[in-house]
């Protein structure tokens, strides 16, 4: 399942798509080195200018120059939101994204806005969370995953 919304100022519409894994599958991993052309295709097929996803729990953002594709004439944005509860990027802190939409200074592009995700990191008591996992029915290796952020 996905969430879609738009920002419209009367002159242009910015279309957002939020998914867990990808628009194709909740279990698909979209990693930072994912093929650029496939990102463009996903955005085009889903009529989105901005796509946010998770699943891999590895935060990144990527601006895609879609003007090289004949069907698009602007830049698109994809980003992985990271993870609040189970980071896998080596940083044990919780990670979430604040999405900033600002006026676009380039009048040649079709959209009047730029999207700038801000990754926010928060400290929390990782050891307390890991011990709670160990005291539960969950496998102890999950506690180690929290401690090591993998």
What are these regions (language model features)?
Residues 11-16, 46-47, 53-56, 73-74, ...:
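Short gly/pro-enriched beta-turn/loop segments at secondary-structure junctions
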Residues 19, 54, 81:
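Active-site flanking residues adjacent to catalytic metal/cofactor-binding acidic residues
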Residues 24-26, 51-67, 86-91:
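Active-site environment of divalent metal-dependent phosphoester hydrolases
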């Amino acid at each position: 399942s996905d969430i879609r919304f738009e920002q419209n100022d009367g002159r242009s519409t910015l279309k957002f798509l939020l998914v867990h894994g990808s628009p194709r599958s909740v279990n698909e991993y979209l990693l930072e080195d994912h093929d650029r052309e496939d990102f463009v295709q996903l955005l085009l097929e889903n009529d989105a200018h901005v796509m946010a996803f998770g699943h891999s729990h590895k935060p990144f953002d990527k601006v895609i120059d879609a003007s090289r594709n004949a069907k698009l004439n602007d830049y698109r944005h994809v980003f992985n939101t990271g993870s609040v509860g189970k980071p896998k990027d080596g940083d044990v802190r919780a990670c979430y994204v604040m999405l900033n939409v600002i006026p676009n200074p380039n009048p040649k592009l079709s959209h009047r806005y730029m999207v700038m995700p801000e990754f926010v990191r928060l400290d929390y008591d990782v050891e307390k969370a890991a011990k709670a996992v160990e005291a539960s029915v969950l496998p102890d290796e999950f506690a180690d995953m929290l401690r090591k952020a993998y």
